[in-house]
Design a protein with these regions (language model features):
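Residue-level signal for inorganic ion chemistry
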Residues: 27, 46, 81, 96, ...
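Acidic, Mg2+-coordinating active-site environments of NTP-dependent enzymes
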Residues: 56-65, 171-309, 334, 358-362, ...
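ATP-dependent carboxylate/acyl-activation modules
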Residues: 96, 297-299, 413-418
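Phosphate-binding loop of NTP-binding sites
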Residues: 76-207, 211, 215-223, 394-395, ...
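Glycine-rich phosphate/pyrophosphate-binding beta-alpha loops
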Residues: 298, 314-324
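N-terminal leader/targeting and accessory segments in enzymes
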Residues: 1-80, 84, 330-334, 352, ...
Length: 423
């Protein structure tokens, strides 16, 4: 089976799924093989559930009469099909990557652009070599543009995702100390993320630049076309303000106050507003979109629980984002406790970076410091240290945190959000 022959079948499908538990009528099921399980064994069952077609990489399960098709690699075929579909699309596609803030920025951009256009965008964090093709394949004729989030933890990954998504516009939120192990250090992070810049330059596509970020400015000096924000002489200039721990932006005499905490979210708001204005959206509509957006994804999420204010930032953590969160949280009025968990994938830099964060937390003078995870426990000798979130939960059952404000921040693998119900 090749993509051109399969494409007419795809056009009749409702959607593509790789999860056999979520098959609906007229879906196409891609049966991926794992180390311990071959989803091809579910092919006939998928057809019985109403699937329009199934793609397998195990030839013994092929049954063309039932629309069960064999390919050598389901992953390769998924990517090839998405590239073929991308070739048929004539809409602006915005590619987005960065060490921190890319998911929040993606959702803000989607909220703003949706004020005027029908916009498809990356659902959740489907931002890898499987998620990006799935997002491209979810773009329907009614969509007028798309926002594609691209994640990476090693070199050449963004390059691959760019060949699939072929963005017309691109933005890198920032360069931080994330996935140091896979990228081979901070310089490797810059090189890996900049693969988006390389693609945009070679394809003569548009780059969005935060001119307050010296790395972005240096990497895009000779790029055209470009959209800029951050400086008074940029294409778009906004000023930051805050109110009740929430960050907002001001454009001329108009203000938009978001439901996001942290000055680090200001540039995310600016990126969304800049793209909105570039695409002809009135600032009043941009204001409405930014003020209406409510984070629900454990990223800079502020929630009230009884008489306490909780800042939930448990989806991801690295030294850059952890430092920014601590500096923001210390500005909250009232007593403050931080519950911080390990920052994963730091490789040889891990012990030093955990020491640096713990030292920063102590210098900022929080009322209480609680750490979770083996890395922090190795360096935390002066305050409460737990090896796991489950261990923390057992402690919290008999020892409630008394502070008015509580920050929870950790890498996803720590599952720190499980402790919320016990705070």
């Amino acid at each position: 089976m090749n993509t051109e022959l399969f494409y007419p079948i795809f056009l009749k499908a409702k959607k593509i799924t790789i999860d056999s538990r979520k098959i609906e009528k007229n879906d196409i099921f891609f049966a991926f093989s794992g180390d311990n399980f071959d989803a091809a064994t579910l092919a006939e069952n998928a057809i019985d559930l109403g699937a329009l077609a199934v793609v397998v990489e195990n030839k013994e399960f092929e049954n063309k009469e039932k629309n069960i098709f064999y390919v050598r690699s389901t992953l390769d075929f998924l990517q090839e099909l998405s590239i073929h579909h991308r070739n048929q699309l004539d809409i602006p596609i915005i590619g987005l990557t960065g060490s921190n803030g890319k998911t929040t920025t993606k959702e803000l951009i989607h909220a703003v652009l949706s004020e005027k256009y029908n916009v498809q965008y990356t659902f959740g964090n489907l931002n890898n070599h499987i998620g990006v093709p799935l997002t491209i394949l979810s773009i329907k004729p009614e969509h007028e543009m798309a926002v594609i989030e691209m994640g990476a933890n090693h070199q050449k990954e963004i390059e691959l995702l760019c060949t699939i998504a072929r963005p017309n516009y691109g933005y890198i939120t920032n360069f931080g100390k994330a996935h140091l192990e896979g990228f081979g250090g901070f310089e490797g992070v810059i090189k890996g993320k900049s693969e988006l810049y390389d693609y945009l330059k070679n394809a003569s596509q548009t780059v969005l630049i935060n001119e307050n970020d010296p790395i972005q400015v240096e990497k895009t000096q000779d790029y055209t076309p470009k959209i800029t924000f951050g400086k008074t002489d940029s294409d778009y200039y906004f000023e930051a303000f805050s109110e009740n721990n929430f960050v907002g932006l001001q454009y001329q005499d108009q203000k938009a106050l978001s439901k996001l905490t942290g000055e680090y979210n200001f540039t995310n708001l600016c990126a969304a507003a800049s793209l909105g204005m570039h695409f002809g959206i009135d600032f009043k509509q941009i204001q409405s979109a930014l003020e209406s957006y409510t984070p629900t994804n454990m990223r800079s999420q502020v929630v009230k629980k009884d008489d306490k204010t909780l800042v939930l930032d448990t989806y991801n953590a690295n030294p850059s984002s952890m430092s920014a969160s601590l500096h923001n949280f210390v500005t909250f009025e009232g007593s403050k406790t931080i519950v911080i968990g390990d920052m994963l994938e730091l490789g040889d830099e891990s012990e030093k970076e955990h020491q640096n964060i713990l030292k920063l937390a102590q210098e900022l003078g929080f009322n209480e410091i609680v750490t979770v995870g083996k890395q922090f426990k190795n360096v935390n000798k002066n305050s409460a240290a737990f090896e796991s979130t489950d261990e923390l939960i057992q402690y919290l059952k008999d020892n409630k945190i008394q502070s008015e404000n509580i920050l929870l921040k950790a890498s996803r693998g720590i599952s720190l959000e499980k402790a919320i119900d016990f705070i």
